[in-house]
Amino acid sequence: GPHPRDNFPFMPSYGYHFDAHKLGQFLRDWATERGVLHRLLKATDVEQGTQAEIAALLCEDGTRIEGDIFVDCSGFRSVIAQQTLGAQFIPFGENLFNDRAVVLPSRHSTRFKPQTDSIAMRAGWRWSTPLTTRVGNGYVYSSKYVSDEDAEAELREAIGMQDEGEARILEMRVGRIAESWTGNCLAAGLSQGFIEPLE
């Protein structure tokens, strides 16, 4: 964004927040317009070649996808890197306690703020991220100190949505795999690891 100048008679108030779903759609469209093949398939099995190499992904519709390099983007399940190639997971839970999140979007606010707010809660912290069509809310917490039900109730009370909307509980594996690259597979994102942002 523009760099604020010292002589502004006001404090600049802007920020950039991206709706992850819309960003994904934009990147898909941008890539397919440039020749990338995009297919919505669910991989159900992984075919190994040598011990540390992947030969193909087998999909539920019978499609077999061969490749030279595979990127494991299967989230916490880490289907290729951990489940198939046996990459070692190094947990950090002994020192980093937050292992759950409850998320609940709320209506777009007319009092737009340019920043994400991070607010302390009883067993963790919560965020409030203003987007153009909604506000993203979530509460990251430790399941050792609060139940999922109590965490949801605490978030609902904090954002004033006691009876509205459907909350989702996310379980997080905090830690990382020992090697991000194994054979011809690169683990990316949550397949490789996760550390809760404020910890």
Q: What kind of region is each of these model predictions?
A:
Residues 5-160:
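Predominantly flavin-linked oxidoreductase catalytic cores and closely associated redox partners
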